[in-house]
């Protein structure tokens, strides 16, 4: 779990996301509160519940990007899901409890990586011994083994092929077996693929011919897993999920009930009702054991173009007490997105063209023109926020990108005139573009 202060979390998010100070502060405080709760002792620690967040803002303003960056910062089990992927319990499709099951798998993956790091030195030594056995045989003299060990460590044998037996990475018995409408064939606490794989002896490895260089990584992973206690790992992962798990629930506005709609709302209000106990705190059965959701942090987000936050069930609104409104992006914000962030669109475009030997030189007025065209098009057609910049920028560099292979060594200046010339038809035909698929 991260030990960053709220100020450090915000400044880390600032490297990649422009504006939206309120949203950054809210998620930073929520993330820090996870650490603060861990410092409490006794029964009070169990009483402190996470303050779930509802982020409201137009499309393309940074909601999903905040989630992506937060996942890397969290250092805890983190899962991003779309609310539209779930259906009400009892109907064909994924029910919301699958969120917790998926989060547990993420937690086990994170914990396994930590455990593997702890035993890496022993695993590397064991992997080296197995490769030596494959090269010279287990009965070779110590002198021969040492000679080959030296060559192995000097990378002299990397291209040599050896035959080794690797355990399969997943169940081999029935790899394609799924229940219709239920990806992963996961029913409550039982995973059918795992069950059938074990019953049919799916854990037995087959000999494979592979180069020495390619053999190292799977062998180290396999030897690490032998040194790790799976039961203890699972218990630790579940504890980590229960105490520090974070779920980012995107597109929550798409499950608001539509007015005037009759009949069963399998993917809308029913899903909201199913989310209530999950967010409030319940126990979900998984194949690894029961998981309590009382202290899992839920961050929901939506554009709310058609619906309003008040269209959500009142009980669900009450379970998302912290509301943050993200602001629409301005011309200045667009200019910052193009140039100021760590992996800005201009930096990406310049780097891509440099691979062909073409140097792009964007002037200040070109950046300004790109930002203004994006705002104009957003205003006249559908406002898709920062995503519009990609459309405009691709149109501007389309010709250069197509002919880059033949222009190696050239420097191409891009100014406001060049931008306007390339996007003239885009800006002129915006009123027609809404009718084009």
From Swiss-Prot:
It comes from the Bacteria. Gene3D superfamilies: 1.10.8.60, P-loop containing nucleotide triphosphate hydrolases (3.40.50.300). Keywords: ATP-binding, Chaperone, Cytoplasm, Nucleotide-binding, Stress response. The keyword ATP-binding applies. The keyword Cytoplasm applies. It is found in: Cytoplasm. One of its GO terms (biological process) is protein unfolding. ATP binds at residues 18, 60-65, 250, 315, 387. One of its GO terms (molecular function) is ATP hydrolysis activity. GO terms for cellular component: HslUV protease complex. A double ring-shaped homohexamer of HslV is capped on each side by a ring-shaped HslU homohexamer. The assembly of the HslU/HslV complex is dependent on binding of ATP. Belongs to the ClpX chaperone family. HslU subfamily. ATPase subunit of a proteasome-like degradation complex; this subunit has chaperone activity. The binding of ATP and its subsequent hydrolysis by HslU are essential for unfolding of protein substrates subsequently hydrolyzed by HslV. HslU recognizes the N-terminal part of its protein substrates and unfolds these before they are guided to HslV for hydrolysis. This is ATP-dependent protease ATPase subunit HslU. It comes from Methylorubrum populi (strain ATCC BAA-705 / NCIMB 13946 / BJ001). The gene is hslU.
């Amino acid at each position: 779990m991260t030990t960053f202060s709220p100020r450090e979390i915000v400044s880390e998010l600032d490297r990649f996301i422009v504006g939206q100070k309120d949203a950054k502060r809210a998620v930073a405080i929520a993330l820090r509160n996870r650490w603060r709760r861990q410092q409490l002792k006794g029964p009070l620690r169990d009483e402190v519940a996470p303050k779930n967040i509802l982020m409201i803002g137009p499309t393309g303003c940074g909601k999903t990007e905040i989630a992506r960056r937060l996942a890397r910062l969290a250092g805890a089990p983190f899962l991003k899901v779309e609310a539209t992927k779930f259906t009400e319990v009892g109907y064909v499709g994924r029910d919301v409890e699958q969120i917790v099951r998926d989060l547990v798998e993420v937690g086990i993956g994170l914990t396994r990586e930590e455990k593997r790091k702890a035993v890496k030195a022993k695993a590397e030594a064991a992997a080296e011994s197995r490769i030596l056995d494959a090269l010279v045989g287990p009965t070779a003299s110590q002198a021969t083994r040492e000679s080959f060990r030296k060559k192995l460590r000097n990378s002299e044998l990397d291209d040599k092929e050896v035959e080794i037996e690797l355990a399969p990475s997943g169940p081999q018995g029935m790899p394609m077996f799924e229940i219709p409408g239920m990806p992963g064939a996961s029913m409550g606490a039982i995973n059918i693929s795992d069950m059938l794989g074990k019953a049919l002896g799916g854990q037995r490895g087959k000999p494979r011919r592979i180069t020495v260089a390619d053999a190292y990584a799977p062998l180290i992973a396999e030897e690490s897993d032998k040194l790790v206690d799976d039961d203890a790992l699972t218990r630790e992962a579940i504890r980590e999920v229960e105490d520090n798990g974070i779920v980012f629930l995107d597109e929550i506005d798409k499950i608001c009930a539509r007015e005037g709609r009759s009949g069963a709302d399998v993917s809308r209000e029913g899903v909201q009702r199913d989310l209530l106990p999950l967010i409030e705190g319940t126990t979900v059965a998984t194949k690894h054991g029961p998981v309590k959701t009382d202290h899992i942090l839920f961050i929901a987000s939506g554009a709310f173009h058609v619906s309003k936050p008040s269209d959500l069930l009142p009980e669900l609104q009450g379970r998302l007490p912290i509301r943050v409104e993200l602001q629409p992006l301005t011309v200045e914000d667009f200019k910052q997105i193009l140039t100021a962030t760590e992996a800005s669109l201009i930096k990406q475009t310049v780097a891509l063209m440099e691979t062909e030997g073409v140097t792009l030189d964007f002037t200040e007025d070109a950046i300004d023109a790109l930002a203004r065209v994006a705002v104009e098009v957003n205003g006249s057609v559908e406002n898709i926020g920062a995503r519009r910049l990609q459309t405009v920028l691709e149109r501007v560099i389309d010709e250069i990108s197509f002919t880059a292979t033949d222009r190696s060594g050239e420097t191409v200046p891009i100014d406001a005139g060049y931008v306007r010339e390339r996007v003239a038809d885009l800006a002129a035909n915006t009123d027609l573009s809404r009718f084009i698929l």
